[in-house]
A protein has these predicted regions:
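Surface-exposed, interaction-prone regions used to assemble/regulate multi-protein complexes
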Residues: 1-117
Length: 117
């Protein structure tokens, strides 16, 4: 699926201010999963064949270990998702940036799948 099609699919889920419930990485970063909940639906984004994964946040966000925070008290809500095509070593890949204030996520991968859980 091309970047523009994925972007349209994401926008159809009305992701703005959706609560992120899970971010997971497997196989040394080859696969990344982001799950968000909106309008009583869980939407899963799967990133496969990842060659770049970048997380950044504020120092204040990590003052208290997140494992000590109850899920209901986590406030990671999506502000923006942008999917674009990118070229890396002459290969066309997908680049996705997710603004989950105060966390920013950027993933460059071969495939992005989006579906309801």
């Amino acid at each position: 699926m091309k970047a523009q099609e994925i972007q349209q699919q994401l926008e159809s889920y009305n992701y703005m201010d959706a609560k992120v419930t899970k971010i997971d990485s497997k196989y040394f970063g080859d696969e990344v999963t982001v799950v968000f909940q909106n309008e009583n639906k869980e939407i899963e984004m799967q990133f496969l064949g990842c060659s770049k994964i970048s997380f950044s946040t504020t120092v204040e966000d990590r003052e208290k270990p997140l494992k000590l925070v109850e899920d209901k008290d986590l406030n990671y809500n999506i502000k923006k998702i942008e999917v674009t095509d990118c070229i890396q070593d002459k290969t066309i890949l997908l680049n996705c940036t997710v603004d989950v204030f105060p966390l920013n996520l950027e993933i460059c991968c071969n495939t992005i799948s989006v579906f309801k859980k």
